[in-house]
Amino acid sequence: MTAKRQKKEKDVIDLMLDQLDFHGMTKDELTGKDGLLRQLTSRFYERILNAEMDEHLGYKKHDNAGDHSGNSRNGYSEKTVILDDNSTAEIAVPRDRNSTFEPLIIPKHEKRTPLFNDQIISMYSYGMSCRDIQRHLQEVYGVTVSADLISHVTEAVMLDA
């Protein structure tokens, strides 16, 4: 990742944080069960799951390309996930009509986030290309993911920043 891109991404995060007024907020309002950090974490995972669904279906939400495609979005199901610090977060997991969507960031029937998902974001932040990340995940974890999925995941995270 170039220094210019790192600066731009840092600026986006700083702009987002500048919009928040932390003055007078209690610890519970920031880090508690329904606190700001938990809400941001939930939104972060939901963005990634929606990017995964876009990749799975081959089109973005509300895109006409999905008309008569044989499979489409079919709402959401609520899921409680256990985070790295053993706290929990509620997230909305997208569903498809054919029930063929297999999320990678939080797999079906799993309540914990796999390590490699944190690795995608970490490797991307260190400047690795989508293809490099794809190759690394395959070699180290035995996980096959498309470069397009990695691209969608990182784009979704940046949009939410």
What are the residue ranges of the model-derived segments?
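Short hinge/gating elements
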Residues: 26-39, 102-107, 114-118, 137-139
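Electropositive nucleic-acid engagement tracts
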Residues: 60-73, 129-161
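Subset of Sec-pathway N-terminal targeting signals
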Residues: 1-77, 83-85
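Basic, short loop/linker segments at the boundary and entry of helix-turn-helix/winged-helix-like folds
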Residues: 70-126, 145-147, 151-155
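Short polybasic/polar patches that bind polyanions
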Residues: 55, 124, 139
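Hydrophobic (often cysteine-bearing) scaffold residues that line and stabilize catalytic clefts
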Residues: 41, 45, 116-117, 129
